[in-house]
């Protein structure tokens, strides 16, 4: 059992958010392997030390104060239009090819979605394209998705076109991932309505001009949680919840789905699609959390030279994610995606905001892991070889035999016992404020039911061969399926 330590509420981040203004033309995105040639890693400290990771675990980043224009206002009466900006909107059309849309998605950044319209003159969204769609498309191209009998020819044609590098319009891709309909709100609606919707399990709201379907902004769960966190001192009803520990709030779920770090990355991609998840925990043989893989990480798989990664282990892919983040940030990075039952809500929200995550894994004290080697330096992690000549995929890529226990997370996290999501937190805020959100678990169940039909049927029968399903009911043992 974790120590009964109540963390003081960590300080808050600034409310200012960077603008995502991007040039109209989408530049060529070099592959991860190409970027490695300019990596300054050899001139940096080789890795984030365990002490530094523990410091991040205990003390998320510092605050710069809330926005004074919201001081003294009832958050429930703030209009949703006050939290969004048109610069967050990025459009593609139904006939835009998926390659262009993928580049736009990667380069646009948060809120990590491209809105789709019928013609370039429309300001009404008919659908969306995000990393869940990209993951579903990737599975089709790899032959790991299995459609209904009536769709077999369509899926086969898509895979064939992809192999031939033929243009594939978004209209042929956006139906691959099962998802809920677009949710819209007028910009004049109060935040109470948005909190109620988000607390019911909806992840994204399109904000429209009053009385129209003209989109003027995108409000995400993360943006709203960050707003309420940064301005918490102005909203006492919510601020008073932050010092409470998770165990006493009784939020989240004691059922979390994870994958062993030694399993193939393709298994993780299938698992996320099959379960309707945007991310999964990666664990070692003792169910200790060692990392996190999300559908957003599929952006590292969009170049031909990255294809060997698909046959690598999840733990190797995590090392690639950390290396890529280090190249972008100029330092090694090991984001902490876990909390414990005695973490405060403030501590949990601060981590969600700092890591831009949708969920935190709930862990208890670490379990001994068989054959756990010393934590390796990330500088020594194997990387994808840069292809020579025409840029073809190396015929025999080699990947290190790195155990799931080798990353820093295996030593400082703990045994996975549950998960807490942005939906859970916003559901708490809604209920505390007298609103009536739906149970977010019902929304999760719907996504999983609708997603399960899109994967190869044989996956269900072999699921136990690679899936670790962690059921953290108090007093029960961990169900480690091997």
Swiss-Prot record:
Keyword Metal-binding among UniProt keywords: no
Biased composition (Polar residues): 433-442
Coiled coil residues, start to end: none
GO cellular component terms, A-Z: cytoplasm; nucleus
Residue ranges with Low complexity bias: 13-25, 451-461
Keywords: CBS domain, Cytoplasm, Nucleus, Repeat
Biased composition (Basic and acidic residues): 462-482
SUPFAM superfamilies: CBS-domain pair
Gene3D superfamilies from the UniProt entry: CBS-domain
GO molecular function, one term: protein serine/threonine phosphatase inhibitor activity
Subcellular location: Cytoplasm; Nucleus
Pfam family, one: CBS
Region (Disordered): 1-46, 366-398, 433-482
Entry's family note: Belongs to the SDS23 family.
Functional description taken from the UniProt entry: Involved in DNA replication and cell separation.
Protein name: Protein sds23
Organism: Botryotinia fuckeliana (strain B05.10)
Lineage: Eukaryota, Fungi, Dikarya, Ascomycota, Pezizomycotina
